[in-house]
Amino acid sequence: MNKIRKGDEVVVLAGKDRGRRGVVLSRVDDERLLVEGVNRVKKHVRPNPLKGEVGGIVEKEMPLHISNVALFNPAAQKGDRVGIRVLEDGRKVRFFKSNGELVDA
């Protein structure tokens, strides 16, 4: 079970966008994820007439390592560590380690 998933709101812990919040758009692989509005770079794109692409400078999000983000805890209003707990009915749920609240209600 992944501790951070697509659609979660996260806080950036390290790097040029430290402290910014964003929503996880996708997981690139097991260790990296795309966060909306965070780690934006300008990419120079060459025109390709065969595909109908015009050239120019495109601004896009680049992946962040999962260790550089923390799940946003709305009760504490900050990034928080996440644990996994097994309930009585056998379901695995995520919870915030600071206050024990369930992430997946």
Swiss-Prot record:
- Any one GO MF annotation of this record: structural constituent of ribosome
Domain of life here? Answer: Bacteria
Of the GO CC terms on this record, one is: ribonucleoprotein complex
GO BP terms in the entry: translation
The protein's UniProt keywords, in alphabetical order, are: Ribonucleoprotein, Ribosomal protein, RNA-binding, rRNA-binding
The protein's role, per its UniProt record:
One of two assembly initiator proteins, it binds directly to the 5'-end of the 23S rRNA, where it nucleates assembly of the 50S subunit.
HAMAP family for the chain: Ribosomal_uL24_B (MF_01326_B)
Family, according to the entry, reads as follows:
Belongs to the universal ribosomal protein uL24 family.
Subunit annotation: Part of the 50S ribosomal subunit.
The name under which this protein is listed is Large ribosomal subunit protein uL24
